[in-house]
């Protein structure tokens, strides 16, 4: 489909105005922009119905394993699929201060995305698994700061820094737009409300990456056998909060427990130059305020239960942990839930050391320039609670040492 995406931008260099007399400000510019962007980043033929061909393993009448080809309906078609549109407003201030010692940009933005393209999960009763659809509206607002500074500059020493900080907040405003009537306990009409989409974990007024799950209150302890038995559990199993205290665990007991993506991030780099020959630099960055699930902490029906290859702690009567269940633990009345841990972390991403051999030492050689380098990638990482591999991908990240020699003949 075709669509139109207009945009406009304005800029004002305040520091060039005659009335501007602030001596320590070298440059000051105010920028504002507005525009509508389009997105149709979906797979080819996403708007068409699809069949899924698979193979299932079964046995014949004699008990021999056989493979049975299957064909099932997978994705529902949607001929009305259209562009996702984002209307964005940006306001920024660029500056340079103290004879160029400090440069930076402060920017804030507001975006409203409508007709959001989503691969929506469908109820089983429809006969389909998923459908690409345009749904609702999501609003984003955020703040970004970037700074570049020369902290110290002497004849034989220079220290420079760069900082980038950003945060973003999003909120689901509407999903389908359909509303239902709301009545009070006496049957009086009090208004209308749009329902949440619990199947896809989308909730009006919440972020699209919000975590909606049962809250874990630790584990059942020795001496609580009778209470745990009411939930078909035993000491060492995770204890879930029954919010309305009705003896059941339903959607009414689920809570908003945090977010799956970082609430803010920052990157800091520093470079030190000594005698124009030695250069040392390092880069730190951090993602903060998000959570990730680690369901091996349940110790339920996994190979790790039997070999514990990942050295995962587990509850015992002698060591009654709250963050990890007993081996072969049981869920409360069979409900499904995840175990969430804080994934906030700070990483020393890179350390670099370089030495440029002075020209006077190369006079009697055919080499005109010689530079030696040492680089360490993923030098160190500190995580608040996450101890299960790299918080970015869950794997055991490598520390890489690189030696280099650059020369010009």
Spans of features found by a protein language model:
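Outer-membrane beta-barrel "beta-signal"
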Residues: 8-11, 144-146, 164, 351, ...
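Transmembrane beta-strands of outer-membrane beta-barrel pores
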Residues: 14-16, 34-38, 108-114, 149-151, ...
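Short loop/turn motifs that connect adjacent beta-strands in outer-membrane beta-barrel proteins
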Residues: 15-28, 98-101, 152-159, 172-178, ...
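Conserved small-residue
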Residues: 133, 150-258
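C-terminal beta-signal and terminal closure region of outer-membrane beta-barrel proteins
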Residues: 135-140, 185-221, 319, 331-333, ...
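Extracytoplasmic gating/loop element in the C-terminal half of outer-membrane beta-barrel translocons
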Residues: 233, 287-372, 376
């Amino acid at each position: 489909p075709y669509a139109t995406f207009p945009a406009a931008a304005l800029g004002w260099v305040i520091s060039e105005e005659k009335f501007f007399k602030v001596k320590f400000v070298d440059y000051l510019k105010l920028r504002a922009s507005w525009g509508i962007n389009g997105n149709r980043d979906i797979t080819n033929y996403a708007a068409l119905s699809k069949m899924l061909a698979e193979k299932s393993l079964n046995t014949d009448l004699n008990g021999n394993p056989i493979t049975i080809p299957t064909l099932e309906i997978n994705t529902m078609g949607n001929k009305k699929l259209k562009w996702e549109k984002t209307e964005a407003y940006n306001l920024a201030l660029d500056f340079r201060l103290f004879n160029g010692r400090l440069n930076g940009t402060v920017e804030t933005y507001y975006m409203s995305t409508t007709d959001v393209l989503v691969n929506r999960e469908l109820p089983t009763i429809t006969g389909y698994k998923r459908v690409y659809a345009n749904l609702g509206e999501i609003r984003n607002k955020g703040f970004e700061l970037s700074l570049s500074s020369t902290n110290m500059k002497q004849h034989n020493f220079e220290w420079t820094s760069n900082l980038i900080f950003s945060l973003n907040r999003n909120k689901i405003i509407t999903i389908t737009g359909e509303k239902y009537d709301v009545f009070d306990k006496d049957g009086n009409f009090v208004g209308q409300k749009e329902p949440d989409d619990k199947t896809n974990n989308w909730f009006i007024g919440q972020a699209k990456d919000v975590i909606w799950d049962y809250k874990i209150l630790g584990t059942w302890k020795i001496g609580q056998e009778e209470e745990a038995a009411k939930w078909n559990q035993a000491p060492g199993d995770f204890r879930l909060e029954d919010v309305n205290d009705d003896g059941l665990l339903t959607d009414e007991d689920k809570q908003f427990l945090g977010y799956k993506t970082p609430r803010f991030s920052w990157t800091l780099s520093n470079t030190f130059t000594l005698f124009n020959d030695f250069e040392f630099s390092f880069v730190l960055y951090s993602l903060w305020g998000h959570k990730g699930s680690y369901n091996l902490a349940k110790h339920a029906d996994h190979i790790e239960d039997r070999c514990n290859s990942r050295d995962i702690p587990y509850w015992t009567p002698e060591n009654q942990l709250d963050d990890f269940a007993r081996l072969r633990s049981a869920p409360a009345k069979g409900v499904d839930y995840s175990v969430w841990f804080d994934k906030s972390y700070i990483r020393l991403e890179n350390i670099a050391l370089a030495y440029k051999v002075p020209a006077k030492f190369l006079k009697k050689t055919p080499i005109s320039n010689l530079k030696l380098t040492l680089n360490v990638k993923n030098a160190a990482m500190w995580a608040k609670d996450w101890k299960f591999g790299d918080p970015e991908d869950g794997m055991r990240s490598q520390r890489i040492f690189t030696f280099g020699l650059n020369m010009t003949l």
